[in-house]
Curated annotation (Swiss-Prot):
UniProt-listed HAMAP family: RNApol_bact_RpoZ
Free-text function comment from the UniProt entry: Promotes RNA polymerase assembly. Latches the N- and C-terminal regions of the beta' subunit thereby facilitating its interaction with the beta and alpha subunits.
Protein name per its UniProtKB record: DNA-directed RNA polymerase subunit omega
InterPro entries the record matches: DNA-dir_RNA_pol_omega (IPR003716), Pol_omega/Rpo6/RPB6 (IPR006110), RPB6/omega-like_sf (IPR036161)
Organism: Edwardsiella ictaluri (strain 93-146)
Quaternary structure and interacting proteins, as annotated: The RNAP catalytic core consists of 2 alpha, 1 beta, 1 beta' and 1 omega subunit. When a sigma factor is associated with the core the holoenzyme is formed, which can initiate transcription.
Pfam families: RNA_pol_Rpb6
GO cellular component, one term: DNA-directed RNA polymerase complex
Reactions catalysed according to its record: RNA(n) + a ribonucleoside 5'-triphosphate = RNA(n+1) + diphosphate
Keyword Transcription (UniProt): yes
Gene that this sequence comes from: rpoZ
Enzyme class: transferase
GO MF annotation list: DNA binding; DNA-directed RNA polymerase activity
Gene Ontology BP terms: DNA-templated transcription
Amino acid sequence: MARVTVQDAVEKIGNRFDLVLVAARRARQMQTGGKEPLVPEENDKTTVLALREIEEGLINNQILDVRERQEQQEQEAAELQAVTAIAEGRR
């Protein structure tokens, strides 16, 4: 079983309440969003992986926001391209 001390993670994020929010958000991304962990898995659960990523400075709230915005922009661009292709096919 992995042992994680959250003190380092709290120091990276600022307070324990924000840490819970960021770690939960990242763990959810790994569980349901198909995102790969940025640290070796070592048979850990996603919550432990999220805390380890935060401790190592690989993830914080700003990083998650930027990544989500980029993914949303990529998805919107792909959708626009698909709609354009459909519209051009009807001409």
